[in-house]
Amino acid sequence: MAIVYAQFAAAQTHADGLAAMQLENWDKAISIYTALTKANPADQTAFLILGSAHLAKGEKDKAKAAFDAAFNAKPDSPLAFVVNGRITMLKNDIVETDVQFKKAAKAGKKDSNVLRQIGESFLYTPTGVKPNFVRAEEFLKMSYEANSKDYTTLMTLGYMYKEKPDGGLAAQQYELAEALEPKNPLPKFMLAKVYKAAKLKDKYLDYLDRTIAISPRYTLALRAKAEAFYYDRKYDKATVAYKALVADGDEVTVEDEMQLANSLFITKDYPASITLVEKIIQKDGSKNYLRRLLGYSYYETGDYPKGMGIMTDYFAKVTPDKVLATDYQYLARLLVKSKGDTLTAVENFKKAIAMDSSTWSLYKEIGELYYSKRDNCNAAMSYQMYLDSVPKPEATDLYKLGLAQYYCKDDTLRYQKAETTFLRITQLVPTAGIGWLWSAKAATKLEPDVQAHPEMAAQFGRARPYFEKYVGIASVDKEKNKKDLIIALEYLTYYFFLQGDVEGTRTNATKLLELDPANQTGIELMEAVKSGTMVPITPGTPGAPGTPTPPVTPTPPNSGGGKG
């Protein structure tokens, strides 16, 4: 066994242990210093630092055992007094602790290691006990005065100030240590950590780059750089950095590979994400998270059957507390693409929204699914919920809502709602004809039936301003807009006829007949104008001779979503 520890210790040094302590990797520190003490049972410093690591981890009994071993290693050395002080500290005997440390300082007044170990006694404390930075600083400064070129003392001073926290003094000590060992990546990396705590992003990244420049395989710096870009949402840079980490790092974990896969997905390099995820799953199939990412990626590449299979497998294995809203979102999309299962897809979209209200934009997809099934009422409801949360609605989305409202047969107010919605389009894009046209179509549904109720003729005309706006816009390209222009001009010709406006009737009938010479409404009303027999229907008049039948309510064109 001693041979095994000796071989392990040969690969470990006090410098490795110092790095583990600086980085607060207590388990690694314990492993290193345990090996060092096994290889050299007389190494009091290793035992003392081993005890400090156990204390930092909250293992008071193990710390006591390490201190006892340190004393037994050399009972007559100055460090033995340090050991005694630490043991009395564990007993909260402040007076005796002070006595022992004074003896240690006197015996080792020119020994920077002894003085540093006294200082560290106040720095690494049991769980729940705050470090005494004043006493730690006192003895660490004494250690520095004993040997201003001692790298370990400078690093410990830097760590003490970092924890205090005093970023300026911490940086100063780490810079001095860096000057002593310019090829050592640790001081540079610790400086990066100081600048990160100070929220000096540029200096943080600069020192990470300096660390990597002298130690290209230094995993902690490679990982920190990738994470900095990732959490700053600079995903392209994060992807490059994660690639460097996975390719060059000396302690790469599966979590690092997973983060690279995630970054590849975010940057839309789906094939690369798929390749990496499948590689990781082959090594470790327990990472169910990766099945999610794989399913997402297959959807994005258009391989819907594979994506559906992966997500089915994922949901069979995942526990409910691990499911994300995006899981339901992608499952819904895959259900539509691979199976055409609209109803189940809608259920999953709703689960996603219920789980995460920030995914409210999915109501738009729900609305489109309902509309594709001609379920106009549910489509209208879903589009409305989507638009209620949109700060600045798009005209195309309002158009879809308006159509769904227009064709929702179960809503007695469908035409009023549709008219209001289409008018919002005219406010957004007043020079586009579509909003005016559909506002008019909705309004015509709300016009009085003057054939059945001639006394209501004066109330006819709700759609007039909308149709007039539409004609003004659409007449620029009469051939393209011919069908809807005919509908608009039929209405306007009839409106002016009802009002007894000869010139208005003539003008619109002329335009109508130019487009459609055989148009019955245009022919009849133009004849009435020419014959001088045009008599408007007025309230109280049961009818008027020669009054033509009003134009049929316009049938919406197929391009306008004519489903109902």
Predicted segment positions?
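Long, low-complexity, intrinsically disordered segments
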Residues: 546-564
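Alpha-solenoid helical repeat scaffolds
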Residues: 4-500, 504, 508, 514-517, ...
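Flexible, disordered linker segments and immediate boundary regions flanking tandem C2H2 zinc-finger modules
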Residues: 536-541
